[in-house]
């Protein structure tokens, strides 16, 4: 299976968006005049996932932290890099610069000794933002999507990783095959005492208990724990470097057995104890790869106890776009032995095999989800995972889908005869469901980074915007990118989680573009 890395990048960005800003407090409003240099001030943990080119194309994941001084300077930091399984640990960030426009868009340049990397960013608040890697220098050519979250330095102790956590790690196994690894663990003072995981490793399903593991300082860089929240841990036999964001979120990058990255988020006490407590519409998005190529599925369902209804699913499988409306044999279960873990299954469009997913809720409102649909041969039909979130704040309409939004998508694009990664980050003002803004897009080998594309387009909302009427009507979005007089239209199907967050995937019936992403309100 060819891994579609939007499954890795968007998981991180989506879960961050669904689980709030992650700063440990109330998200402050922007300055009355908009964002500025002082909007980025403090330590921020970042993650990106994508590709790099040094003689040949290879997969690349980064996790690290940088410190911004509120005046346009990066004063320090550290990062860990996994390049298709080749790990470089504890790379010092020696300096850098950044700029923030009033709309929250800007750039960050991180200096790594004699070399540098550059990110295009859009702030979603002063606590967090979305980014793409748009490094294009003689020393490095790389792209990828991700995000950054303000850290709480008061949480920089291994003993602070305490309580139940839900995690989602995705990427490559030790043979460079796609892997999705999700689950939960209980930690007491930085020592993992129990847990459970579901792993889809290149189509092979493995589930099991997590027994032991300890969050500790890294002997390679012991001081980085107290300075940056960085350390090492082993989970289910795999080694990771971690970065503490705060007491409720930890970021991870594998340092053995492949290239996995993701977040663990504290699980709260609102998770449903049984299916009788389920009573909501849920939107979800998974992305990854199938036997045909890149894959995205975005959709929604209503859970009323163990009953599942009003199912909508939109699948883009290597350019084959299929819509599922309604379903039979639909049900949802919860695993009493592993709090927050459950499964949902439904059959539609005459499929011989139903769609099946396993999920882990971090609260009653959000969690992570992994596809475990099996083919007729008993192996996975896809390696894909993503986010699941309860729909709130409906009806969605021109009244509440309004204001300033950050925009990010990632996936595959076929341009100039070359298929490789495409990443976009931008900002748009939504007025009467019309879009107006700017964005950077990186079509890797084909066109390189293109800055400051004009963004226009529109959103069409059907019914109350949730899709809970069970009809074939979908919300749609048209995004038009214009640069130097040339315009490109990209059509999407959109599922609103709330007035502040939407999930989308494009509806192309060819392999020229296969992307998925988020629209997140700026605060």
Residue spans for each PLM region:
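Sec-dependent bacterial lipoprotein signal peptides
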Residues: 1-17
């Amino acid at each position: 299976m060819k891994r579609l890395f939007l499954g890795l990048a968007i998981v991180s960005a989506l879960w961050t968006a669904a689980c709030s800003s992650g700063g440990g407090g109330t998200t402050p409003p922007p300055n009355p005049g908009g964002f500025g240099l002082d909007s980025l001030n403090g330590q921020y943990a970042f993650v990106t996932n994508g590709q790099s080119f040094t003689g040949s194309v290879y997969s690349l994941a980064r996790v690290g932290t940088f410190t911004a001084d509120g005046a346009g300077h990066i004063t320090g930091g550290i990062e860990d890099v996994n390049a298709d399984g080749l790990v470089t640990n504890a790379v010092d960030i020696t300096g850098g610069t950044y700029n923030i426009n009033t709309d929250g868009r800007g750039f960050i340049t991180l200096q790594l000794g004699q070399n540098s990397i550059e990110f295009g960013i859009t702030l979603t608040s002063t606590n967090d933002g979305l980014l793409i890697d748009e490094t294009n220098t003689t020393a490095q050519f790389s792209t990828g999507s991700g995000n950054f979250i303000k850290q709480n330095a008061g949480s920089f102790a291994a003993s602070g990783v305490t309580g139940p956590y839900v995690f989602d790690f995705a990427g490559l196994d030790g043979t460079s095959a796609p892997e999705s690894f999700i689950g939960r663990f209980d930690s007491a003072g930085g020592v993992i005492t129990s847990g459970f995981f579901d792993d889809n490793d290149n189509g092979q399903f493995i589930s099991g208990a997590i027994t032991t593991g300890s969050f500790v300082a890294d002997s390679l860089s012991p001081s980085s724990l107290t300075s940056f929240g960085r350390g090492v841990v082993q989970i289910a036999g795999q080694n990771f470097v971690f970065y503490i964001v705060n007491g409720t979120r930890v970021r991870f990058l594998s340092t053995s057995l492949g290239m996995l990255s993701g977040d663990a988020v504290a699980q709260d006490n609102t998770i449903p104890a049984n299916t009788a407590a389920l009573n909501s519409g849920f939107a979800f998005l998974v992305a990854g790869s199938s036997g045909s190529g890149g894959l995205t599925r975005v959709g929604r369902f209503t859970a009323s106890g163990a009953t599942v209804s009003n199912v909508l699913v939109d699948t883009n499988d290597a350019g084959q776009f299929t819509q599922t409306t309604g379903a039979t044999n639909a049900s949802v279960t919860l695993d009493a032995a592993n709090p927050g873990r459950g499964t949902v299954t439904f059959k539609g469009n005459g499929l011989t095999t139903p769609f099946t997913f396993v999920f882990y809720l971090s609260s009653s409102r959000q969690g992570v989800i992994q596809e475990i649909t099996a083919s007729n041969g008993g192996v996975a039909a896809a390696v894909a995972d993503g986010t699941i979130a309860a729909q709130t704040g409906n009806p969605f309409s021109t009244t509440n889908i309004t204001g300033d939004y950050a925009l990010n998508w990632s996936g595959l694009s076929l341009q100039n005869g070359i298929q490789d990664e495409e990443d976009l980050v931008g900002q748009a003002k939504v007025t009467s469901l019309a879009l107006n803004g700017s964005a950077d897009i990186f079509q890797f080998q084909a066109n390189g980074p293109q800055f400051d594309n004009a963004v226009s387009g529109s959103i069409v909302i059907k019914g109350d915007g949730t899709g809970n009427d069970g009809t074939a009507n979908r919300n749609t979005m048209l995004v038009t990118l214009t640069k130097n007089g040339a315009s490109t239209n990209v059509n999407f199907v959109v599922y609103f989680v709330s007035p502040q967050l939407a999930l989308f995937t494009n509806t192309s019936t060819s392999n020229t573009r296969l992307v998925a992403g988020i629209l997140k309100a700026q605060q």
